Amino acid sequence: MRKSFYGEEVRDAVLNAAQISPDDTVLDVGAGTGFLTQGAAMIARKVIALDFSRGMSDESIAKLGRGKVEFRIGNVEHMQLPDSSVNVVIGNMVLHHYPHPDMAIAEMARVLKPGGRIAISDLQGHNYEWLRKEHADVWLGFKMEDVLAMMKKNRLEDVKVDELSSCCTSTQEEQQVKIPMFLASARKPV
């Protein structure tokens, strides 16, 4: 399903920016059907796939099995995980679904261990209001400088927010639109 929105190069960009190692515990926020989870599970010791939708999690379980992936139902703005409990946080197309993206980033920073890494991709700002109804989008993307500010506000270091070469494509009434995406990465101080 997700391949119709964006390509494998988005997954590769997020996973490369996250610098996952074989000893890492990775949290995939807004894991959905496992777009990033699958790639992270090939590298990491353990992956926690968090999504608010039981249906998405069930689809991911059917596709990936359980193996070294732990599936959890939950809200990214209020995660039921201990402080400093994961080495890496990854996410794709999650921030624009939450009312308080700054709170979501604060939670991601909270659960990261000192020295841990975060890498998330999402939509840049756009004006396609119909996505609010068709895809349950709360935000119509973000300005990259706003994402940079949210990450710095949460005391993350080495923050980078760059435009991805890939776009998110969606169709309404036979009109295909391409929305630019960004990749944000950072590190929690030691």
Segments from the language model and where they lie:
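Conserved SAM-binding loop and adjacent beta-strand
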Residues: 1-13
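Class I SAM-dependent methyltransferase SAM/SAH-binding core
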Residues: 27-78
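A short acidic, Gly/Pro-enriched loop at the edge of an enzyme's catalytic core
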Residues: 77-88
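A short SAM/SAH-binding and catalytic strip from SAM-dependent methyltransferases
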Residues: 87-100
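A short glycine-rich, Lys/Arg-flanked "PGG" loop and its adjoining helix->strand segment in the class I
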Residues: 102-117
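C-terminal lobe and adjacent flexible extensions of AdoMet/dcAdoMet transferase-like proteins
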Residues: 184-190
